């Protein structure tokens, strides 16, 4: 029952949603790794990070509801919200990887920054908040 409701709320489980889930989980894990490496691991900061990640999925669900109830068909808002957060999480993930000393392929940086720049028009404030890292 819960799975069915989540599927309806999120607009189904497609490749975009799976990609977002992967990016969110990996970004959170790399954020924890950075905090561990810096000796700043905090359950309070971690909980706040989890709350922010949950909010991402609530916003995807809200966008889906707006697509279905207001626009009527398609998934324009849902797709835009997912692209925004995939790019945001991807940029954050690369920052975390760089912070841990991992070299980042330039092409990957370019693609994520390009995607981030295109979706940045959705909300400049949200992208600044997410870039603070977890």
Question: What are the functions of these language-model segments?
Answer:
Residues 69-99:
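Hydrophobic alpha-helical transmembrane segments and immediately flanking/interface helices
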Residues 59-68, 123:
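Hydrophobic alpha-helical transmembrane segments in multi-pass integral membrane proteins
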Residues 1-9:
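Short, strongly hydrophobic alpha-helical membrane anchors
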Residues 87-134:
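Membrane-proximal cytosolic segments adjacent to transmembrane helices
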Residues 36-45, 96-104:
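A cytosolic-side transmembrane-helix exit/cap motif
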Residues 15-26, 78-85:
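Hydrophobic core segments of alpha-helical transmembrane domains in multi-pass membrane proteins
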Residues 4-5, 32, 61, 65:
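Alpha-helical transmembrane segments of multipass membrane proteins
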Residues 38-59:
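Juxtamembrane helix-capping/reentrant segments at transmembrane boundaries
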């Amino acid at each position: 029952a819960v799975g069915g409701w989540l599927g309806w709320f999120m607009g189904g489980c497609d490749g975009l949603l799976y990609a977002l889930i992967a990016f969110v989980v990996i970004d959170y894990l790399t954020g924890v790794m950075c905090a561990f490496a810096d000796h700043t691991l905090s359950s309070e900061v971690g909980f706040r990070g989890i709350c922010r990640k949950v909010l991402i999925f609530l916003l995807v669900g809200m966008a889906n509801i707006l697509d279905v109830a207001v626009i009527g068909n398609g998934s324009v808002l849902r797709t835009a919200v997912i692209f925004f957060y995939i790019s945001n999480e991807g940029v954050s993930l690369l920052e975390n990887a760089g912070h841990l000393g991992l070299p980042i392929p330039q092409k990957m940086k370019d693609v994520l920054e390009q995607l981030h720049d295109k979706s940045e028009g959705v909300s400049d404030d949200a992208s600044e908040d997410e870039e603070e890292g977890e």
